[in-house]
């Protein structure tokens, strides 16, 4: 596989035919792609039931959801590169939910306090030829022990809302992290090195206007 250093330099302005479609409504993934010079031509999130199956393990679950997103959206965009991702926070074999309310976020933070957890990032790409390519990445994160006051103060904001595991490492929760092993961007929402390499390896080249 080739890695994405072909984006460097002013002379490389061509792109293989076909647009890039992001099968996600996550603003974090849009921002992360922008960091490496990738701007989707379209954003078309998949509407899926993302409930884990009984006894489904975290990594296979993340891979299944990313794959399902890409395959659901690809038929709507023939001739495009369709990129999908899924991020899962796991403590042991347990998949932590996306926190949609403060009670859920509090439960997640209490579970993560003083402990190590995994963040699994799965990406799936459907090429213009209809080929499905998948990758998954695991980052290890260790939180310091959180006091009740620290948790309450964090929950008083809203950056936890909608986040897997009830926290956003790119925000105030960065102060909770004792150490991190692996991809930081994966913990934010998309493993950029692997995403860039996957796209470059299939012939995608970002276009540039002007």
UniProtKB/Swiss-Prot annotation:
One of its GO terms (cellular component) is cytoplasm. SUPFAM superfamilies: ITPase-like. Keywords: Cytoplasm, Hydrolase, Nucleotide metabolism. Residues 1-22 are annotated as: Disordered. It is found in: Cytoplasm. Its cofactor is a divalent metal cation. The active site is at residue 86. Its EC number is 3.6.1.9. The keyword Hydrolase applies. NCBIfam families: maf. Belongs to the Maf family. YhdE subfamily. This is dTTP/UTP pyrophosphatase.
């Amino acid at each position: 596989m080739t890695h994405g250093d072909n984006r460097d330099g002013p002379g490389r302005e061509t792109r293989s035919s076909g647009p890039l479609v992001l099968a996600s409504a996550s603003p974090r993934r849009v921002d992360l792609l922008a960091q490496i010079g990738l701007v989707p031509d379209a954003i078309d999130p998949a509407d899926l039931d993302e409930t884990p199956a009984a006894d489904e393990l975290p990594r296979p679950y993340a891979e299944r959801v990313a794959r399902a997103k890409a395959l659901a959206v690809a038929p709507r965009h023939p001739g495009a590169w369709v990129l999908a991702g899924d991020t899962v926070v796991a403590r042991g074999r347990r998949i932590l939910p996306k926190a949609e309310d403060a009670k859920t976020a509090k439960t997640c933070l209490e579970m993560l306090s003083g402990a190590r957890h995994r963040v699994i990032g799965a990406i799936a790409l459907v090429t213009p030829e209809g080929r499905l390519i998948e990758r998954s990445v695991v980052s290890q994160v260790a939180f310091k022990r959180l006091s009740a006051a620290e948790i309450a103060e964090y929950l008083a904001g809203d950056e936890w809302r909608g986040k897997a595991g009830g926290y956003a490492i790119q925000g105030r929760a960065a102060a909770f992290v004792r150490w991190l092993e692996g991809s930081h961007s994966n913990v934010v929402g998309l493993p950029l090195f692997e995403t860039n390499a996957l796209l470059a390896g299939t012939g995608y080249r970002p276009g540039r206007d002007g």
